[in-house]
């Protein structure tokens, strides 16, 4: 069993590769991809992504390919067992969360309920 399977949230190779490209474009190697959950959206909660150059007390950091994904403790409790991925398709390119804790999700996949 690898260390990756023990993590509460997976950070896919595709997501890490895209983060690496975006950070290189910004020319700031201290940036990390932060995933968070806020109230809102059509299903009650919604996912958010931003680049952040700091890690707060209690944040979980997951590193892959020399880049980091950061999640605050409150958001992590809703994301345990999930994954952060990057897709390109007819709907455009975007980071997506696969969340096994979501009972319902909206059509675009950016909001959910538990």
UniProtKB/Swiss-Prot annotation:
Its cofactor is iron-sulfur cluster. InterPro entries: FeS_biogenesis, FeS_cluster_insertion, FeS_cluster_insertion_CS, FeS_cluster_insertion_RrpA, HesB-like_dom_sf. Binds 1 iron-sulfur cluster per subunit. PROSITE patterns: HESB. One of its GO terms (biological process) is iron-sulfur cluster assembly. Coiled coil: none annotated. The keyword Metal-binding applies. One of its GO terms (cellular component) is cytosol. One of its GO terms (molecular function) is iron ion binding. Iron-sulfur cluster binds at residues 42, 106, 108. Keywords: Iron, Iron-sulfur, Metal-binding. HAMAP family: Fe_S_insert_ErpA. Belongs to the HesB/IscA family. Homodimer. Required for insertion of 4Fe-4S clusters for at least IspG. This is Iron-sulfur cluster insertion protein ErpA.
């Amino acid at each position: 069993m690898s260390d990756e399977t023990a993590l509460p949230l997976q950070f896919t190779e595709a997501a890490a590769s895209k983060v690496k490209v975006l950070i290189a474009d910004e020319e700031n190697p201290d940036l990390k991809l932060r995933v968070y959950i806020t109230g809102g959206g059509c299903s009650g909660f919604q996912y958010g992504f931003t680049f952040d150059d700091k890690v707060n007390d209690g944040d979980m950091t997951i590193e892959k390919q020399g880049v980091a994904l950061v999640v605050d403790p409150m958001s992590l409790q809703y994301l345990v067992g999930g994954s952060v991925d990057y897709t390109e398709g007819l709907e455009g390119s975007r980071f997506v969360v696969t969340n096994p804790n979501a009972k319902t999700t909206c059509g675009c996949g950016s909001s959910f309920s538990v």
